[in-house]
Amino acid sequence: MNNRVHQGHLARKRFGQNFLNDQFVIDSIVSAINPQKGQAMVEIGPGLAALTEPVGERLDQLTVIELDRDLAARLQTHPFLGPKLTIYQQDAMTFNFGELAEKMGQPLRVFGNLPYNISTPLMFHLFSYTDAIADMHFMLQKEVVNRLVAGPNSKAYGRLSVMAQYYCNVIPVLEVPPSAFTPPPKVDSAVVRLVPHATMPHPVKDIRVLSRITTEAFNQRRKTIRNSLGNLFSVEVLTGMGIDPAMRAENISVAQYCQMANYLAENAPLQES
């Protein structure tokens, strides 16, 4: 039997489809999400409704975003979920979550078993809507969750860690083995909770500057910042901020990156493109 077929649907590699089928894991995730009636719940990539059904049971309405036309059609005709669902058959990577929150009159609670091939770019897309989001619960590749929660001085710490923690409080929830899916992925998975900060702990004046600094630093992570960021900061400026120029990208805290971004925004602002 083709192990890519689950509930009569052939998992599509180009959509990165792996369907969750372990009831204990499903119950644990739904319990962590704790959906309540009246909340603006939004699922990305509902697939064969492994999470959609138990979450939908607790709600009067649920919004789902599904790129796969066949799966969106299945949900439309679902015996008990159908009437509760608002289905957007489109790519979450281009979806306007701000408009949806405005339409629903409250911040969104977003969740999903995300396709691993788009999880990192989708995170960055969602970070741009954190004003419109109450919280997020996602199943991701375990390695991505490790990067989201990593602190300085660790191999997993990178640009994703800095940007995620700038916007959100990041909390690992549970680990999930490949056997919980059909077809089983080649990697371990984990569930993470991201709660956008009500008050930014380290506000920056221009997010594009923070994005640029972290990109340049981590693209050359083995170099000291004296070298990787030498085109942006002199040794004197770094020292004046209390940042050792001999440190590497992975040694610098989120607070320090934000401090550097604010210095640059004030002293060498980016031109509007």
From Swiss-Prot:
Reactions catalysed: adenosine(1518)/adenosine(1519) in 16S rRNA + 4 S-adenosyl-L-methionine = N(6)-dimethyladenosine(1518)/N(6)-dimethyladenosine(1519) in 16S rRNA + 4 S-adenosyl-L-homocysteine + 4 H(+)
Binding residues annotated for S-adenosyl-L-methionine, in chain numbering: N18, L20, G45, E66, D91, N113
Listed GO CC annotations: cytosol
Coiled-coil features, chain-numbered ranges: none
Taxonomy, superkingdom: Bacteria
This enzyme's EC code(s): 2.1.1.182
Statement: the UniProt record of this protein carries the keyword RNA-binding: yes
Listed GO MF terms: 16S rRNA (adenine(1518)-N(6)/adenine(1519)-N(6))-dimethyltransferase activity; RNA binding
Compartments, as annotated in UniProt: Cytoplasm
Membrane-spanning segments: none
UniProt keyword list: Cytoplasm, Methyltransferase, RNA-binding, rRNA processing, S-adenosyl-L-methionine, Transferase
PROSITE patterns (alphabetical): RRNA_A_DIMETH, SAM_RNA_A_N6_MT
InterPro entries listed in its UniProt record: KsgA/Erm, rRNA_Ade_diMease-like_C, rRNA_Ade_Mease_Trfase_CS, rRNA_Ade_methylase_Trfase_N, rRNA_adenine_dimethylase, SAM-dependent_MTases_sf
PANTHER family according to UniProt: DIMETHYLADENOSINE TRANSFERASE, DIMETHYLADENOSINE TRANSFERASE-RELATED
Role according to the record: Specifically dimethylates two adjacent adenosines (A1518 and A1519) in the loop of a conserved hairpin near the 3'-end of 16S rRNA in the 30S particle. May play a critical role in biogenesis of 30S subunits.
Classification via NCBIfam families: ksgA
Similarity comment text for this entry: Belongs to the class I-like SAM-binding methyltransferase superfamily. rRNA adenine N(6)-methyltransferase family. RsmA subfamily.
The name this protein goes by in its record: Ribosomal RNA small subunit methyltransferase A
Gene, per the UniProt record: rsmA
